[in-house]
Amino acid sequence: MRYIIILAVLFINSIHAKITSYKFESVNFDSKIEWTGDGLYNISLKNYGIKTWQTMYTNVPEGTYDISAFPKNDFVSFWVKFEQGDYKVEEYCTGLCVEVKIGPPTVTLTEYDDHINLYIEHPYATRGSKKIPIYKRGDMCDIYLLYTANFTFGDSEEPVTYDIDDYDCTSTGCSIDFATTEKVCVTAQGATEGFLEKITPWSSEVCLTPKKNVYTCAIRSKEDVPNFKDKMARVIKRKFNKQSQSYLTKFLGSTSNDVTTFLSMLNLTKYS
């Protein structure tokens, strides 16, 4: 009778064996599966075009498991199989190059005597203890990112957007120089061209306040000129004597008018 009870319990457990949830996610080619289900499972993977299944884990409970070493880093699909006794279930993935998400770049600002350097470090994959930049590598789907940086100067509420040219990039990151002595904050985002359509999150914002006392003001259109004029008028009033103020105020007025005219001409050219 005892053997019959044991067999009955085993039979009941096999009936209730079931994967109740499953999730695959790969960020920077760090690939993991997360699943829930009763009991212990053998987990294997098969890439498209290969007949055999690769054993990844044996007799493991529900949880999160690293499978980075098993899917091919290309566009072929693959399957993940869970087995417990006679119960089997296969989960399909369209391919690592399609599914992988790319994390944000890392931004650094460094001040030099006559300029500031913006350095954007590529997101990287981890292979053991090595950090490998994700940039035009065949084993990482030939992914490379084109970056957009948002600069915020001084007390401005609106950022200035700048697209980084790939000519400014190497296999490790992108570097551009610029000049300002107002506080500047920068954040960057990367995106691929083509059908993969990868877009990273925005990086953490970094800020730098230069030491030199030179004043700048971002002008993107003629609507920004009055703000520039008001700001420079305050600088003239605070930093120069009355005799100099008169000359500099006239010069500021004529310069502001010239800038407004120039920007208006550019706008007409743009829409002509």
UniProtKB/Swiss-Prot annotation:
It is found in: Secreted. It comes from the Viruses. One of its GO terms (cellular component) is extracellular region. Disulfide bonds: none annotated. Homodimer. Interacts with host IFNG. Belongs to the type II cytokine receptor family. This is Soluble interferon gamma receptor OPG193.
